[in-house]
């Protein structure tokens, strides 16, 4: 089985991650105690991608939860699916990063990163055939940005042949729904893009053109046809699409997304990503001049 180890760092990353586990646990028929209550064999066929089967038929997420202060960890534990995680996989400090990138990357985060890597190593050792990691974190603040980038660099050093993919996000539910759609091919049986390596081969025409953009439709729960969903997902006004992987669910899929009768998710390799890099560069230049 091709497993994925999930990491979530900082307040934003943990809130998105908690919502993500709620969504995919619901899709796989896993209740908050880790017990399977589904009604389809498809839900269990590739469940080991994100879950480890423990004693007593319990399913435990392959998740590592990280923060530099205990507050977020407490809120995750007290959440609806807080008891499903392995207690040893909560790694947190006491001081916090104070929205300071340098603290998360060089001081407090650097002191905690070895403990995080030990937990990541244990999760990786329990996998039969690890295909990669996914990390949810914010691009601002201290822990998510500072320690998030530190974790990515450390993972690249220790697992150089794995694909590291930071995710995107503002709205937790939208991000978790998009992540659920993107990982559908990995979690359920299919012929196309069944693991991260195949996805990378299909989506990256040239090594340096490896920046993906996600899309999701519909944003409101209403009846749509497949052509209407496709039209909502794509924006042909900005940039040119080099490669696209689209996942349509419910009309042609036995397991629909939660709360929607039909949805579509895509990952696109588009030249429109250059506008994001330009905007970040301009904002950095403006702040640096001050």
From Swiss-Prot:
It comes from the Eukaryota. A motif (MREI motif) lies at residues 1-4. The modification Phosphothreonine is found at residue 55. One of its GO terms (biological process) is microtubule-based process. The keyword Magnesium applies. Mg(2+) binds at residue 69. It holds the Pfam family Tubulin. Its main location: cytoplasm. One of its GO terms (cellular component) is microtubule. One of its GO terms (molecular function) is GTPase activity. GTP binds at residues 11, 69, 138, 142-144, 172. The modification N6-acetyllysine is found at residue 58. Keywords: Acetylation, Cell projection, Cilium, Cytoplasm, Cytoskeleton, Flagellum, GTP-binding, Magnesium, Metal-binding, Microtubule, Nucleotide-binding, Phosphoprotein. Belongs to the tubulin family. Tubulin is the major constituent of microtubules, a cylinder consisting of laterally associated linear protofilaments composed of alpha- and beta-tubulin heterodimers. Microtubules grow by the addition of GTP-tubulin dimers to the microtubule end, where a stabilizing cap forms. Below the cap, tubulin dimers are in GDP-bound state, owing to GTPase activity of alpha-tubulin. The highly acidic C-terminal region may bind cations such as calcium. The MREI motif is common among all beta-tubulin isoforms and may be critical for tubulin autoregulation. This is Tubulin beta-4B chain. It comes from Mesocricetus auratus. The lineage of its organism: Eukaryota, Metazoa, Chordata, Craniata, Vertebrata.
